[in-house]
Amino acid sequence: MAGVGSCNVADLDLPAEVREHLAGAWGIEELYPPQAAAMPAVLAGESVLLAAPTASGKSLVAYLAILRRLLVDEIGSRAIYIVPLKALASEKVDELNELCGAVGLSVGIGVGDRSSESKKLDDADVLVCTSEKFDSLLRNRERFLEGVSVVIADEIH
């Protein structure tokens, strides 16, 4: 850590490919104070509730929690990223596809009752879904949570 309230991406205990992608492709070299404050707990695998203003980087903290868990702590496990709206799910899938693709992880989306989603839901390392879809999966798929090591709830109100 560079100083109180700051954190250089290069110093994070994450795989080199993740740090390189953040700095190179996304231009992120230093975390914002709310992100830096959350990282010790995230990197320790603790449960975290992050409340911060809009555009303060909460999603990046969630992404890093997912990558740390799937690439370091529980290799071969899966993640679920729950959002309230289909439009937000699409946005998160785009961002996660770029970041996860750089490290060999796949991302799937679950936003409706389309049967074509079924196989993709099972195969995805990271599943982004609406809260309604998540509820449906819990009720209708007995073994849905098997292998899941991290769950992110975004935009809870």
What are these model-derived regions, one by one?
Residues 1-11:
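Interdomain "pre-motor" coupling segment immediately N-terminal to P-loop NTPase/helicase cores
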